[in-house]
Amino acid sequence: MTIRSPEPEVKILVERDPVKTSLEKWAQPGHFSRTLAKGPNTTTWIWNLHADSHDFDSHTNDLEEISRKVFSAHFGQLAIIFVWLSGMYFHGARFSNYEAWLSDPIHIKPSAQVVWPIVGQEILNGDVGGGFQGIQITSGFFQIWRASGITSELQLYCTAIGALIFATLMLFAGWFHYHKAAPKLAWFQDVESMLNHHLAGLLGLGSLAWAGHQVHVSLPINQLLDAGVDPKEIPLPHEFILNRDLLAQLYPSFAKGLIPFFTLNWSEYSDFLTFRGGLNPVTGGLWLTDTVHHHLAIAVLFLVAGHMYRTNWSIGHSIKEILEAHEGPFTGEGHKGIFEILTTSWHAQLALNLAMLGSLTIIVAHHMYSMPPYPYLAIDYGTQLSLFTHHMWIGGFLVVGAAAHAAIFMVRDYDPTTQYNNLLDRVLRHRDAIISHLNWVCIFLGFHSFGLYIHNDTMSALGRPQDMFSDTAIQLQPIFAQWVQNTHASAPGLTAPNAIASTSLTWGGDNLIAVGGKVALLPIPLGTADFLVHHIHAFTIHVTVLILLKGVLFARSSRLIPDKANLGFRFPCDGPGRGGTCQVSAWDHVFLGLFWMYNSISIVIFHFSWKMQSDVWGSINDQGVINHITGGNFAQSSTTINGWLRDFLWAQASQVIQSYGSSLSAYGLLFLGAHFVWAFSLMFLFSGRGYWQELIESIIWAHNKLKVAPAIQPRALSIVQGRAVGVAHYLLGGIATTWAFFLARIIAVG
């Protein structure tokens, strides 16, 4: 008798043709909601249409259907990203001076946009060098193209076309995986398989592919460019890939092929996989051989990580088991029940991912200037400032988004019956202690950090400089930060074996990298002024966290409104007859959190902009004397509020205010226009709904008088809608004002 092993069960993971493709249905506005599909009676309809069109939770309660919509939407998002990237590369190919910049990146500035003369706009086309007239760009694309080994505009064309093809594929995939072969819920909930594929596939193989490209294409091309070879003389990428002898001329270990790899003699490859530290003195960017080594190491780590989770075989980790095993002496049931949250609530997943991605984006902002990854990035001050500012803003928005979705999870997806005495439940039960302590911390930080400035302003005003907190009077040196800097600067070998220099020049030492007479990077001194402003950072960040965390922890209930969960994520007040219960919804906390996020990030980017202009950026003459843009005035001037207003905001706004009649005049107009947008927001934020409803009714009366009354009845925005429009314009106006101020300044002086 033969005993057969049981036949493996084939899991059916997709459903065929679940939703028919119907253009008629899509053409009907509001098709996803019975109420909205009836069409508009009042102007509120258009607002609700925008508010709910992507709120898949409100379309259906079926988790599988919601998951499919989210999955499909992600492909749409990727398509948009590919179209955007294609546009960037197309501008580089069609309208830019990339090839000229590549031949002389020190004297020629990047430009990829030429303004058409219609009513005299050609004034905006400034001279960027090399006889090219255009708008100076600060996105960093030229630098990243050079680092990837792009040597001609034809290559940019090809990449742009490739990106469009990928965009089409993504759109097709989004349609296919919703209408033709939609995954089942079990597929979305198979977290181990998802982890394995994302870690090994996206991060592991993605990094490996990039490392391979860097080794075979970027390194040799950049090596030749650094040596001053004309880009047109450099062999094309496929020649390096197909002809090993070409590479061996630049990196001798290539002649040995894979023998050192299989004989574990890996140090043979140290001519193109290095641990040098510091910056390449020719380009002022990280050594590309270091970044290749980094991507190879990342690839190895993630390829290993992508084999750690248990799927079809009975080996490997199970996320549920890991979570449930985490019980400490003071944590009750630990993480029991958390796995179920993460597999049934997309909002909970999204909240975690946004919090981590937001933090990571802010870390990226700080690394882009301290370890500039691309050639000639460090001496392009406009791009340095733009990249820092951009990544800080994005990080701030993502972190607020994390709180928003955490609160939506609490309101819509949290089931108190399954969460008993685990960590989430315990946090919710002692939320009063958390919030009241955090509130105390905010008050302490606010009074003490701002108090130090007010003390300085008072002493300065009374003519008593010797009684101020500054490097030349009462010193408050950031000794811990200086210790961290010193440790890194004095012992680079602790970071990596045989490292020649520390990870970043900013740590200290006497190293200075200048490219073409401009400072790329040097050790950044920290003093009393930095100590003061860092405590302002601590204050604003803690207040942001207080508002957002209170919104999450009190999203379902509070002493004031015990049944808050029944009112939903956003509601104006707890009904008539309950005064003093307005603006308490989780949505309102996100609304308020956005303002404090804006405060936090503004002070960070102001600090960065002034500090770099004062202590890092500038020119260096043949004698080695550095002339900083603002002459090192940060340490003395920024210790008073008056100094920030006078020597930063006012002094540095002169370029944007005086830009009319020059190629920077667009920034002057933007500065004015964005101030207007910002001021417009106050109209929504400072007035109540009733005021507008009353006004609208008298306007309707006038229309009726003239027999031109509209069929769709006009109504004032709801309270929540008004606040949403207000905060959107506040942020848009504020960010665009800052953008114009920064760029006009840094392009003029940088």
From Swiss-Prot:
Tree of life domain: Eukaryota
Q: Which keywords are on file for this protein? A: 4Fe-4S, Chlorophyll, Chloroplast, Chromophore, Electron transport, Iron, Iron-sulfur, Magnesium, Membrane, Metal-binding, Oxidoreductase, Photosynthesis, Photosystem I, Plastid, Thylakoid, Transmembrane, Transmembrane helix, Transport
InterPro entries per the UniProt record, alphabetical: PSI_PsaA, PSI_PsaA/B, PSI_PsaA/B_CS, PSI_PsaA/B_sf
Return the GO cellular component terms, semicolon-separated.
chloroplast thylakoid membrane; photosystem I
- Tell me which EC number(s) this protein carries: 1.97.1.12
Q: What class of enzyme is it?
A: oxidoreductase
Ranges annotated as spanning the membrane: 70-93, 156-179, 195-219, 291-309, 346-369, 385-411, 433-455, 531-549, 589-610, 664-686, 724-744
GO MF terms, alphabetically ordered: 4 iron, 4 sulfur cluster binding; chlorophyll binding; electron transfer activity; magnesium ion binding; oxidoreductase activity
According to its UniProt record, where is this protein mainly located?
plastid
- As given in the record, the signal peptide range reads none
Q: How is the cofactor bound?
A: P700 is a chlorophyll a/chlorophyll a' dimer, A0 is one or more chlorophyll a, A1 is one or both phylloquinones and FX is a shared 4Fe-4S iron-sulfur center.
Residues involved in chlorophyll a' binding: 675
One BP annotation, GO: photosynthesis
From the UniProt record, list the reaction(s) this protein catalyses: reduced [plastocyanin] + hnu + oxidized [2Fe-2S]-[ferredoxin] = oxidized [plastocyanin] + reduced [2Fe-2S]-[ferredoxin]
Topology in the lipid bilayer is annotated as: Multi-pass membrane protein
Residues holding [4Fe-4S] cluster: 573, 582
User: Which family does the record assign?
Assistant: Belongs to the PsaA/PsaB family.
**Known HAMAP family for this protein?**
PSI_PsaA
Q: How does it assemble?
A: The PsaA/B heterodimer binds the P700 chlorophyll special pair and subsequent electron acceptors. PSI consists of a core antenna complex that captures photons, and an electron transfer chain that converts photonic excitation into a charge separation. The eukaryotic PSI reaction center is composed of at least 11 subunits.
| Protein name per UniProt | Photosystem I P700 chlorophyll a apoprotein A1
Q: Which organism is it from?
A: Psilotum nudum
**This protein's encoding gene:** psaA
